């Protein structure tokens, strides 16, 4: 087999595996979230369908896929129909430049668990994952429903504001490493536990985590939907498989965000003592993913004015200060 044919086949297989695994993980994440929230609230959670309630996921999928797909008569039908698809596609595309695990050898060839190892991988991931929100905005706007439009508008304001916070935090990382490549950032932290960037950039870590909660529409910083204020927000008019596409896109973005935090701040897939790198990657990413559930159970939803004041009066000044300190450190 020629090198080009092997490369094309390898890339196709990687894409299929990523879509299959992350779509499945997005479904399993709902079961995990319900169990974790039940534990925090001293409940049992799903436990009736199958062992430990695991088959509940299959039952929910059957219910979701058999629901009627309703398109409101007064909506912008084409945009309303494609918005969920845009959300899922952008979430999966963002995974293309993320190195998942250490490289390994297969059939005498070195395989890198990444679809596209590009020099501007960090910029690519942030850009494509940010596009997921435009699907949310388009879906809310096209619904022609006051709750949907209000949720989309609130979300648009928050994402524009907090992307500045996340970007400033990432610029500090780029200044230290000197590269946009996620592989280079991972390798920068290969000298042991104290080479992890969380110790060199603790403030950037906190800022990026907060921005990530906004990016993935998670409590307590989610403004796009709130049962007590705007019902389901942008998703009020969605049902069936189209709502499921939004759901898959959101949870895929959450998983991608957890992996990205691990690569940027927690040593990535580098080995730790006698623990292989791939195990460390899974453990650290799972721990960060658990934070989504922990925060939802522990903190109340913030009001929109509180979220925006925190951004402009606290987080952006801190991000700029961190950037200045990092610049001085690099120069000196």
Swiss-Prot record:
Q: How does it sit in the membrane?
A: Multi-pass membrane protein
The first-level EC class reads: translocase
Known InterPro entries for this protein? NADH_UbQ_OxRdtase_su1/FPO (IPR001694), NADH_UbQ_OxRdtase_su1_CS (IPR018086)
Q: Where found?
A: Cell inner membrane
Can you name one GO molecular function term for this protein?
NADH dehydrogenase activity
Q: Which domain of life is it from?
A: Bacteria
Q: Does the keyword Transmembrane apply?
A: yes
EC number(s) stated in the UniProt entry for this protein: 7.1.1.-
- Catalyses which reaction(s): a quinone + NADH + 5 H(+)(in) = a quinol + NAD(+) + 4 H(+)(out)
Q: Which GO terms describe its biological process?
A: aerobic respiration
One Pfam family this sequence matches: NADHdh
- So what does this one do? NDH-1 shuttles electrons from NADH, via FMN and iron-sulfur (Fe-S) centers, to quinones in the respiratory chain. The immediate electron acceptor for the enzyme in this species is believed to be ubiquinone. Couples the redox reaction to proton translocation (for every two electrons transferred, four hydrogen ions are translocated across the cytoplasmic membrane), and thus conserves the redox energy in a proton gradient. This subunit may bind ubiquinone.
Q: Which PANTHER family match?
A: NADH DEHYDROGENASE SUBUNIT 1 (PTHR11432), NADH-UBIQUINONE OXIDOREDUCTASE CHAIN 1 (PTHR11432:SF3)
What protein name applies here?
A: NADH-quinone oxidoreductase subunit H
Q: Which organism is it from?
A: Campylobacter jejuni subsp. jejuni serotype O:2 (strain ATCC 700819 / NCTC 11168)
């Amino acid at each position: 087999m020629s090198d080009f044919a092997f490369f094309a086949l390898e890339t196709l297989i990687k894409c299929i595996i990523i879509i299959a695994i992350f779509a499945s993980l997005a479904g399993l994440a709902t079961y995990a979230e319900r169990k974790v929230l039940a534990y925090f609230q001293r409940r049992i959670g799903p436990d009736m369908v199958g062992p430990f309630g695991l088959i509940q996921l299959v039952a929910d999928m059957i219910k979701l896929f058999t629901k009627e797909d309703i398109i409101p008569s007064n909506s912008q039908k084409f945009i309303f129909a494609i918005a969920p698809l845009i959300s899922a596609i952008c979430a999966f595309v963002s995974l293309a430049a993320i190195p998942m695990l250490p490289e390994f050898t297969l059939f005498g060839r070195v395989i890198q668990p990444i679809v596209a190892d590009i020099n501007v991988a960090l910029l690519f991931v942030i850009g494509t994952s940010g596009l997921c929100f435009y699907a949310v905005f388009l879906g809310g706007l096209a619904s022609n429903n006051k709750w949907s439009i209000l949720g989309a508008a609130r979300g648009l304001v928050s994402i524009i504001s907090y992307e500045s916070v996340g970007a400033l935090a990432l610029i500090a990382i780029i200044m230290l490493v000197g590269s946009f490549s996620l592989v280079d950032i991972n390798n920068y932290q290969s000298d042991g536990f104290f080479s992890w960037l969380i110790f060199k950039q603790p403030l950037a870590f906190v800022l990026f985590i907060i921005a990530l909660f906004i990016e993935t529409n998670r409590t307590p910083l989610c403004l796009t939907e709130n049962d007590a204020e705007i019902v389901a927000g942008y998703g009020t008019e969605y049902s069936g498989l189209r709502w499921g596409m939004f759901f898959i896109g959101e949870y895929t973005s959450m998983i991608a965000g957890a992996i990205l935090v691990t690569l940027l701040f927690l040593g990535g897939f580098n080995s730790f003592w006698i623990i292989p790198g791939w195990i460390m990657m899974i453990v650290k990413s799972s721990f960060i993913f658990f934070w989504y559930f922990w925060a939802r159970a522990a903190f109340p939803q913030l009001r929109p004015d509180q979220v925006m004041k925190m951004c402009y009066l606290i987080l952006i000044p801190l991000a700029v200060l961190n950037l200045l300190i990092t610049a001085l450190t690099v120069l000196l």
